[in-house]
Amino acid sequence: MDSQGKKVVVCDNGTGFVKCGYAGSNFPEHIFPALVGRPIIRSTAKVGNIEIKDLMVGDEASELRSMLEVNYPMENGIVRNWDDMKHLWDYTFGPEKLNIDSRNCKILLTEPPMNPTKNREKIIEVMFETYQFSGVYIAIQAVLTLYAQGLLTGVVVDSGDGVTHICPVYEGFSLPHLTRRLDIAGRDITRYLIKLLLLRGYAFNHSADFETVRMMKEKLCYVGYNIEQEQKLALETTVLVESYTLPDGRVIKVGGERFGAPEALFQPHLINVEGVGVAELLFNTIQAADIDTRAEFYKHIVLSGGSTMYPGLPSRLERELKQLYLERVLKGDVDKLSKFKIRIEDPPRRKHMVFLGGAVLADIMKDKDNFWMTREEYQEKGTRVLEKLGVTVR
């Protein structure tokens, strides 16, 4: 709470999950899937102890997903369906989750870097007009990740469910001209895993199977350190084969798909996306930075978001960066490679890093009036109140 007794809420609206809670806390109060479902057939009124409603949100929708047509209001970090997004926020602020009176609260929201201004304007409009929060702040996710890690300078590789960003931050300011965006993230890897499983003869084609495959991905997938070696193992042996039990009791076997699906992060052409993979994008970003800041950036690469949780990802990233540096900067001179210092930080709680950073920032700033956009300012200026965010508060 701030000095006037107003609650300060932190809400990290991801493409796949909503993480919400309060300023100063060190873990989200609630984490639930960002999905909205509508029943396909109204044959039963109850399943177990959950009542089937015309509109199901979050955890409830996830549990009953086999009976629902499920929609994700956000795609690639951007709100695509505002009506469903409002249902998601109603659920977040309502009795099921935070149970707050939004008129007496301030809220810190997060957004991906390079988010369209239109999207931000609409968020502000909904927060002030529909929910009537007394103060709102929208923070850039990458900056919050660094705050949570106790850094002011570094490069954040943030890969969630909808979008992957590589965002250099210098002295607490994100550098938009160097920020790179890769529209491959968790959801695309899940889709690709569905495709690979189809080639093995397993069909997952209902909208609800998507969640099932996502859970399988989180349990079994990893990033291969040496892809040729992994492929050889997959073809010639059964060491990679794991059994997985589906919700309906069937057991399926998964092998080379375990490293094949996340490989799309490093080789986008596998899923028909143009451009370079995450390692080369990271290398290009740092090399495009001012020469005096490059060494700092290489030493402070911070991973963030659920799609960086694959075992093997940090070491693969480091291997590819060293390889690229050797080829393109040192022109193949191996002796000089020992001077090249690189450090990839993979904090264990990186799945919720953005929320944690938001909780820290909101707590520090809870009584600073020039930090928050207020309801009065919004009534006076409309969406021009966003100019207040143009200045990064340090």
Swiss-Prot record:
<dbReference type="GO" id="GO:0005938">
    <property type="term" value="C:cell cortex"/>
</dbReference>
<keyword id="KW-0547">Nucleotide-binding</keyword>
<dbReference type="GO" id="GO:0005885">
    <property type="term" value="C:Arp2/3 protein complex"/>
</dbReference>
<comment type="subunit">
    <text>Component of the Arp2/3 complex composed of actr2/arp2, actr3/arp3, arpc1b, arpc2, arpc3, arpc4 and arpc5.</text>
</comment>
<dbReference type="GO" id="GO:0035861">
    <property type="term" value="C:site of double-strand break"/>
</dbReference>
<dbReference type="GO" id="GO:0034314">
    <property type="term" value="P:Arp2/3 complex-mediated actin nucleation"/>
</dbReference>
<dbReference type="InterPro" id="IPR043129">
    <property type="entry name" value="ATPase_NBD"/>
</dbReference>
<feature type="binding site">
    <location>
        <begin position="160"/>
        <end position="162"/>
    </location>
    <ligand>
        <name>ATP</name>
    </ligand>
</feature>
<dbReference type="GO" id="GO:0005524">
    <property type="term" value="F:ATP binding"/>
</dbReference>
<dbReference type="GO" id="GO:0003779">
    <property type="term" value="F:actin binding"/>
</dbReference>
<dbReference type="InterPro" id="IPR004000">
    <property type="entry name" value="Actin"/>
</dbReference>
<keyword id="KW-0067">ATP-binding</keyword>
<keyword id="KW-0966">Cell projection</keyword>
<dbReference type="GO" id="GO:1905168">
    <property type="term" value="P:positive regulation of double-strand break repair via homologous recombination"/>
</dbReference>
<dbReference type="GO" id="GO:0045944">
    <property type="term" value="P:positive regulation of transcription by RNA polymerase II"/>
</dbReference>
<protein>
    <recommendedName>
        <fullName>Actin-related protein 2-A</fullName>
    </recommendedName>
</protein>
<keyword id="KW-0539">Nucleus</keyword>
<keyword id="KW-0206">Cytoskeleton</keyword>
<comment type="function">
    <text>ATP-binding component of the Arp2/3 complex, a multiprotein complex that mediates actin polymerization upon stimulation by nucleation-promoting factor (NPF). The Arp2/3 complex mediates the formation of branched actin networks in the cytoplasm, providing the force for cell motility. Seems to contact the pointed end of the daughter actin filament. In addition to its role in the cytoplasmic cytoskeleton, the Arp2/3 complex also promotes actin polymerization in the nucleus, thereby regulating gene transcription and repair of damaged DNA.</text>
</comment>
<comment type="similarity">
    <text>Belongs to the actin family. ARP2 subfamily.</text>
</comment>
<dbReference type="GO" id="GO:0005634">
    <property type="term" value="C:nucleus"/>
</dbReference>
<feature type="binding site">
    <location>
        <begin position="305"/>
        <end position="310"/>
    </location>
    <ligand>
        <name>ATP</name>
    </ligand>
</feature>
<dbReference type="GO" id="GO:0005737">
    <property type="term" value="C:cytoplasm"/>
</dbReference>
<dbReference type="GO" id="GO:0042995">
    <property type="term" value="C:cell projection"/>
</dbReference>
<feature type="binding site">
    <location>
        <begin position="214"/>
        <end position="218"/>
    </location>
    <ligand>
        <name>ATP</name>
    </ligand>
</feature>
<keyword id="KW-0009">Actin-binding</keyword>
<keyword id="KW-0963">Cytoplasm</keyword>
<dbReference type="InterPro" id="IPR020902">
    <property type="entry name" value="Actin/actin-like_CS"/>
</dbReference>
<dbReference type="Pfam" id="PF00022">
    <property type="entry name" value="Actin"/>
</dbReference>
